[in-house]
């Protein structure tokens, strides 16, 4: 699991990258939770997503947003973090020119950034959002959502509400 330092919009971006073994394997970009609350690429959910994609043969990359770990810059309320994610995705795709599938996976704040990136990058073919903070950030830009994906949210998660309306949507519950 080699460390990679990339040039980003605000300087260095610290990354961990694993190249898939097969030519043309799919790629996945993993995005961590809120930097201002201690989120980093070493968060256990972020790390678990990274490992799962790696175990399934993907070329996968996780990184620290600006101001976290060895990444330069400072928190920018999502705008700069989106620019970081776009720069990292550019690099990931440049290392995997024959890949036909690109996935985004984000945890909390990372899911909000990932969904914004997906709306700007039509080549993203799928997503995973873990505990998307719909009560803190506006996800209305996803109507309509351009790709298929998975939203994972704990039924009793009180720190990150999935919906804020009095009548929730129907959700499939898997146990």
What is each PLM-predicted segment?
Residues 163-168:
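Conserved small/polar residues in nucleotide/adenosyl-binding loops
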Residues 97-106:
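Alpha/beta-hydrolase fold nucleophile elbow
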Residues 76-95:
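Alpha/beta-hydrolase active-site loop
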Residues 54-70:
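Conserved alpha/beta-hydrolase
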Residues 23-53:
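Short, surface-exposed "cap/lid" segments of acyl-processing enzymes
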Residues 106-110, 114:
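Gly/Ala-rich beta-loop-alpha elbow adjacent to hydrolase catalytic centers
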Residues 1-23:
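N-terminal cap/lid segment of alpha/beta-hydrolase-fold proteins
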Residues 151-153:
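Short beta-strand/loop motif that positions the catalytic acidic residue
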């Amino acid at each position: 699991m080699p460390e990679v330092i990339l040039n980003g919009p605000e300087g260095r971006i610290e990354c961990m990258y694993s190249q898939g073994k097969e030519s043309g394997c799919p790629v996945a970009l993993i995005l961590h939770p809120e930097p201002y609350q201690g989120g980093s690429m070493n968060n256990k959910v972020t790390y678990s997503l990274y490992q799962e994609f790696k175990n399934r043969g993907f070329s996968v990359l996780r990184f620290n947003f600006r101001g976290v770990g060895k990444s330069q810059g400072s928190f920018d309320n999502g705008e700069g973090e989106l620019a970081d994610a776009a720069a990292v995705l550019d690099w990931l795709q440049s290392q995997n020119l024959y890949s036909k599938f690109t996935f985004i996976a984000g945890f909390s704040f990372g899911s909000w950034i990932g969904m914004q990136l997906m709306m700007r990058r039509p080549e993203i073919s799928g997503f995973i959002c873990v505990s998307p903070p719909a009560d803190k950030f506006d996800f209305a830009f996803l109507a309509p959502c351009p790709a298929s994906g998975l939203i994972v949210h704990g039924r009793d998660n009180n720190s990150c509400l999935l919906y804020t309306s009095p009548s929730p949507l129907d959700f499939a519950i898997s146990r």
